[in-house]
């Protein structure tokens, strides 16, 4: 079973995340930010992951630390749960429509950290979440998981729909990338390591 539980405590946040790649063993999300909870729930549901997130952050300051640190720990969970990455597909690309919006996320579980984020989020706040922290979340996940992550909105108007499209596409792209293919011997790289 590919799974991980990681705790991270700083003066700004206390976070514990449990991730199960192979079984949708339950989804429980509590970050203290309703909109972030909603997005992580969508991510786990559409990625078919078991995900438990418990976070207490300094929301009296702002949502930045909670959002970024949640991304860090989620990325660390993916890295740990994937282990040596034997037999995984490695790549995933998904387009997800949300009414007038179309989002795309592509990932490469390459061992190299990189984020390309191309989404104009015109509404500065969604519930308790500053929309500028959406990019911070994806950067934190990409760097902690050591993966390439490209997230973009091809078109759309509603900021909620844009962010929701990206989180759903991220879940589906990660599902594709972590899937074990019995035809892949070792790791999916000519280098022999990823």
Swiss-Prot record:
E.C. numbers: 4.2.1.19
Primary location group: cytoplasm
Any Gene Ontology biological process: L-histidine biosynthetic process
GO molecular function: imidazoleglycerol-phosphate dehydratase activity
Localization per record: Cytoplasm
Family annotation (NCBIfam families): PRK00951.1-2, PRK00951.2-1, PRK00951.2-4
Protein name (database record): Imidazoleglycerol-phosphate dehydratase
Organism: Lactiplantibacillus plantarum (strain ATCC BAA-793 / NCIMB 8826 / WCFS1) (Lactobacillus plantarum)
Gene name of the encoded protein: hisB
């Amino acid at each position: 079973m590919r799974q991980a539980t990681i705790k991270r405590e700083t003066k700004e946040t206390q976070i514990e995340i449990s991730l199960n790649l192979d079984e949708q063993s339950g989804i429980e999300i509590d970050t203290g930010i309703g909109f972030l909870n909603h997005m992580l729930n969508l991510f786990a549901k559409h990625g078919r992951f078991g995900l438990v997130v418990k976070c207490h952050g300094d929301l009296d300051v702002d949502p930045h630390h909670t959002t970024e640190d949640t991304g860090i720990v989620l990325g660390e969970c993916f890295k740990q749960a994937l282990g040596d990455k034997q037999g995984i597909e490695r790549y995933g690309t998904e387009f997800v429509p949300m009414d007038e919006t179309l989002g795309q996320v592509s990932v490469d579980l390459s061992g190299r950290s990189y984020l390309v984020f191309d989404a104009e989020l015109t509404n500065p706040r969604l519930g308790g979440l500053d929309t500028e922290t959406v990019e911070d979340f994806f950067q934190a996940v990409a760097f902690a998981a050591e993966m390439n992550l490209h997230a973009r909105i091809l078109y759309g108007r509603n900021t909620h729909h844009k962010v929701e499209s990206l989180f759903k596409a991220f879940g589906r792209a990660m599902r594709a990338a972590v899937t074990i293919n019995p035809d892949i011997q070792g790791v999916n790289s000519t280098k022999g390591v990823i």
